[in-house]
Swiss-Prot record:
Modified residues (Phosphoserine): S83, S123, S126, S242, S263, S314, S560, S584, S648
Biased composition regions of type Pro residues, renumbered to the chain: 622-635
Subcellular location: Nucleus; Cytoplasm, Cytoskeleton, Microtubule organizing center, Centrosome; Cytoplasm, Cytoskeleton, Microtubule organizing center, Centrosome, Centriole
Sequence ranges of Acidic residues compositional bias: 460-469
Full protein name: Nuclear protein MDM1
Gene Ontology molecular function terms on file: microtubule binding
Motif ST]-E-Y-X(3)-F motif 2: positions: 189-195
Family: Belongs to the MDM1 family.
Length: 714
């Protein structure tokens, strides 16, 4: 018979058999593979003829591996050959011929024996164990009975053990006992080799016999341990707040005692324990007072205590306080109500006195020249302390510190006051100026470009003369002459503004003029807000212009009184820009912005802080001929004249809030109006806050109405 040589493949070398307690039972010996070989049909338990096999089964032959590739360890080849031959005294001639073939094969097995696959493990001892398996398996293959009629007494001891194992397996299956599944180790997948079948520990023989007895007898109920654990890991680990159980009585214990599953060995011991338990229960019943039994179904309906409910309460039962969530107190609705009232109070208090820096874009817009003056009140020289306290924008600390250090350098005074020559009122440091008689002017320096072009030659001469002359008298005369020029210009502008306001008031309900009328009136081309702004209420919010265009003629006509300045060079432009950024207008009230947006403003802040003078030296209305050049008076310069949005829009382009005829606020205030300053200041603050809160209330009402109409009333 030719020798078919097959060496160990790479797969067999890399993926070794993982040794476990199942690997021994799944050993690939012939007795394990064919446990029914040599057994009679009654021993096999066959009661009917086998059905036809639909698929042809190819017999499996073990690969022949040469002995030179096998390492048998300490086992010598003589031990392999010396296994005893089975004797067959009554075999016919055909069987004798087969026996000769078997002896010839055993002679060849010295060089190339037919060996089944070894079971391998990762340990170093597995090779020696595999070698011993080879020896046993060779003995089994050499002694396999060829004919079923050969008696069991001629089989070897190894074969008889395998047959006994097969019988035991069949008997256990018939008896209904749990049998370890026998898999062919050669056909095991890699998954089956790595993940071994989990089986319970083998039971004791006495317990197995007891099981067989219960299975065979029909009258004795079979005892089977509950192999499936019905209690989940969650129930085992989580011992929540269990409901209060009713006390158990002795009668209940007697009725339910058969529910406990006890092994037969322990039942005899339980009888004595049961008697002791009953005696203890009787003693307990005597000592404990009887409780009124309440049925369990009336204690809690629909609320099962779970881990989630024990750990996570509903959000309504928590309160975030001092950085941690705590349980809610009983007066939670009252606290919410109180907090909402406080928030509403703060909101009303802030309206009209605070301006967000997010709206700086609106302050810097070119459209601010169209707002009119909102107040006609006097200077703040004698503002009382209670009014100053009501003005939230004031800075009392800076008022105290800055007033103590008046500057004595005339150059600084000259530079700073050149930028503020038109100021006719006195301001105390630390008090904002919402009620100052503000002269109309362009919002920022960018609007003054057209007038700069016209007046540059004259202004340069004035600058040179200002640097040379330091006389205060001549400065006062020139300053008053400038005031008279302003009065003449004011009247012409007021007439023009009257025409625009009269045309705008002609609309029935007040509010913005329609777009066709605005086009007829002409003027600056507005943004897309022409179509999107509401007819009544609301301000025009504009985006900053990327390129600063030269101011057209229309803007020159609509400029305010403050657009005339005696000196406008690059230095004063930077100064005015710095001061305007420092004092961000807050709905008419000036506040100090501690975070200037540009670097050039930071350089000039210190100069403005130093230049201060006592208020009493400044005349309110100096009278001088207009021909003199101004040497400016010394005024407190830290609080710059406001370049803020004053009041409501008067330009016909921006008719949003026009509902009543206004008095002409562009006239300079008379001297008699400066008597009762406190009342004017109080009324100004209250009127401004009331107007802003009214607008906010109207906007909120419109939003609520729109929401109700959209979603439907609830």
């Amino acid at each position: 018979m030719p020798v078919r040589f097959k060496g160990l493949s790479e797969y067999q070398r890399n993926f070794l058999w993982k040794k476990s307690y199942l690997s021994e039972s799944c050993n690939s010996s012939v007795g394990r593979k064919y446990p029914w070989a040599g057994l009679r049909s009654d021993q096999l338990g066959i009661t009917k003829e086998p059905s036809f096999i639909s698929k042809r089964r190819v017999p499996y032959h073990d690969p022949q591996i040469s002995k030179s590739l096998e390492w048998n360890g300490a086992i010598s080849e003589s031990n392999v050959v010396a296994s005893p031959e089975p004797e067959a005294p009554e075999t016919p001639k055909s069987q004798e011929a087969e026996q000769k073939d078997v002896t010839q094969e055993r002679v060849h097995s010295l060089e190339a024996s037919r060996v089944p696959k070894r079971t391998r493990s990762h340990s170093a001892d597995s090779r020696a164990e595999g070698a011993s398996d080879v020896e046993n398996n060779e003995g089994v293959t050499n002694h396999t009975p060829v004919n079923e009629n050969v008696e069991l007494e001629h089989s070897t001891k190894v074969l008889s053990e395998n047959v006994d194992n097969g019988l035991d397996r069949l008997l256990r299956k018939k008896a209904g006992l749990t049998v370890v599944p026998s898999y062919n180790a050669l056909r095991n997948s890699e998954y089956q080799r790595q993940f071994v079948w989990k089986t319970s520990k083998e039971t004791a023989p006495a317990f197995a016999a007891n099981q067989v007895f219960h299975n065979k007898s029909q009258f004795v109920p079979p005892f089977k341990g509950n192999s499936v654990i019905h209690e989940t890991e969650y129930k085992r680990n989580f011992k929540g707040l269990s409901p209060v159980k009713e006390p158990k009585l002795r009668n209940d214990l007697r009725e339910n005692r058969n529910l406990e599953t006890v092994s037969p060995e322990r039942k005899s011991n339980k009888i004595d324990d049961r008697l002791k338990l009953e005696a203890e229960m009787e003693l307990k019943d005597l000592h404990q007072p009887k409780r009124k039994l309440t049925p369990w179904k009336h204690q809690r309906l629909g609320k099962v205590n779970s881990e989630y409910r024990a750990k996570f309460l509903s959000p309504a039962q928590y309160l975030y306080k001092a950085g941690a969530w705590t349980h809610v107190k009983g007066n939670m609705p009252n606290q919410v109500k109180e907090l909402r009232e406080k928030a509403e109070f703060y909101r009303k208090r802030v309206q009209g006195t605070h301006f967000s820096r997010d709206h700086l874009n609106q302050i810097l817009s070119d459209s601010n020249c169209c707002w009119d003056v909102s107040s006609t009140t006097s200077s703040e020289g004698t503002v009382s302390s209670n009014i100053r306290a009501l003005d939230l924008a004031g800075d009392p600390t800076s008022h105290k510190t800055l007033q103590k250090c008046p500057s004595t350098e005339p150059e600084e005074k000259g530079n700073i006051v050149e930028e503020q020559p038109q100021k006719n009122t006195t301001e105390k440091l630390g008090v904002s100026a919402p009620t100052i008689p503000v002269r109309r002017r362009l919002a920022w320096d960018t609007e003054n470009t057209s007038e700069d072009v016209q007046k540059q030659p004259g202004e340069k001469e004035e600058e040179d003369d200002n640097e040379e002359e330091g006389d205060r008298k001549t400065g006062k005369q020139a300053f008053m002459g400038e005031q008279e020029k302003l009065d003449v210009r004011e009247k012409s502008k007021a007439d023009k503004m009257k025409e625009g306001s009269d045309s705008s008031v002609s609309s029935e309900k007040g509010g913005r003029l329609p777009t066709p009328k605005l086009r007829e009136l002409g003027g600056i081309q507005r943004t897309h807000h022409d179509l999107t702004t509401p007819a009544v209420g609301g301000a025009v919010l504009v985006s900053p212009s990327k390129m600063k265009p030269p101011a057209p003629e229309q803007r020159k006509r609509m400029t305010s009184q403050d657009c005339l300045e005696t000196s406008k060079n690059d230095f004063t432009k930077k100064e005015s820009r710095a001061v305007s950024l420092l004092t961000s207008p807050a709905a008419g009230i000036k506040t100090v912005d501690p975070l200037p947006l540009r670097e050039d403003s930071e350089d000039n802040i210190h100069k403005f802080a130093e230049a201060t003078l006592p208020v009493s030296k400044i005349p309110k209305y100096p009278t001088n001929p207009p021909g003199q050049l101004p040497s400016p008076p010394h005024v407190p310069s830290y609080w710059h004249p406001s370049r803020r949005i004053q009041g409501s829009l008067r330009d016909p382009e921006f008719q949003h809030n026009v509902g009543k005829a206004r008095m002409n606020n562009l006239q300079l205030p008379q001297h008699e109006a400066f008597n009762d300053e406190d009342e004017d200041r109080l009324s100004e603050i209250s009127a401004r806050s009331a107007a802003s809160s009214l607008r906010a209330f109207q906007t909120l009402a419109r939003a609520k109405k729109r929401k109700e109409n959209f979603w439907g009333k609830t």
